[in-house]
Each structure stands twice: as C-alpha cells, then as structure tokens.
Amino acid sequence: MLEKIVRQIIDGRDISRKEAEFLIDVDLQQLKQAANQIREYFCGNDFDLCSIINGKSGRCSEDCKYCGQSIHYQTKIKVYDLLEKEIIEDIAVYNANQGVGRFSIVTSGRYLSDEEFSKIIEIYQYLNNRVKISLCASLGLLNLEQFNELKAVGVKRYHNNLET
C-alpha cells in the first residue's frame, strides 16, 4: 500500500484519510525512504532558498513567547518602521546576484496598516520590474483583496507562521 500512496502523490493526486492513517503504522525507515522518493521526484537534489529581509521590526502586539519582536518582552532588537524601497531593493539585488531564487519581505505585527500595505505594494511592483528574483511575502494576516494585490505585483508565495 505504501508504494501505491507514493505513486498517487507523485501523480499529483490526494490520498484518502484511510491512506493517511495507514502511514502512522508504517516502519519509520520505510516511511523515510518513501518520503525521499517523493522528494527526489519533485526536487531532485536541489533546494529552494528564500532569503528574507526584516522589513519592519519590533512592536508586535502578539505574545509569542519565543519571539524577540513582541512588545510583551524586553529584548534588544532594533525597532524600526517599514524600510525604504531603496534599502529593500539593494538587499534583493544582492541576493539575486548571489544566486538566491526567492526573496521575501517579512514584517512584524499581526497586520500592516493600510498605508504600510500600500507602500509594500509599491515596493513589490518596483522589485518585480527591476530585480530578477522570485518574490515572496510574510506580512501578517491579509484579506483576499490584499492577497490579490500582492499576486498582481508579482508575489508568488506567501509565508505564514502557524503556532500551536
């Protein structure tokens, strides 16, 4: 059954709940070999690197115990508002020249203000037109319209931290 599941995944088909539950009891070594077979099919021996820039630092209202950006803890991180377009462009160009395939602006906070989001859209539009690198984003919670705006200016992937 494990081989059948591997083939389904490689063929781009979903597995059923029953098949997923089957994987719980598979020998760990066999499971690792199956996962490696899937990885080799989709990725070969390459990896996809996304470099990030801390586009806005500190003063986050969230209370993530591990995070130095939270206002709930005294840390020594630099606190600053959204970086200027030229600073972000310089870092994106540097990464592209180093062979990095993806670049993401990461901002602290649950949300960006409307003004900050508009500025981010301008920055991504600028990068998309001038820097040969795939664009990603990690900007907190967004609505559908904001996701569509990011997509329209060339953002291909969205990173999200899911904490339990």
Where would I find each of the regions flagged by the language model?
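Short, charged low-complexity intrinsically disordered segments located at boundaries
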Residues: 33-37, 60-70, 155-157
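Canonical Radical SAM [4Fe-4S] cluster-binding loop centered on the CxxxCxxC motif
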Residues: 44-87
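Conserved, mostly hydrophobic/aromatic
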Residues: 12, 35, 64, 105, ...
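Core AdoMet radical
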Residues: 72-164
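Flexible, acidic/Gly-rich N-terminal and inter-domain linker regions that tether
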Residues: 1-61
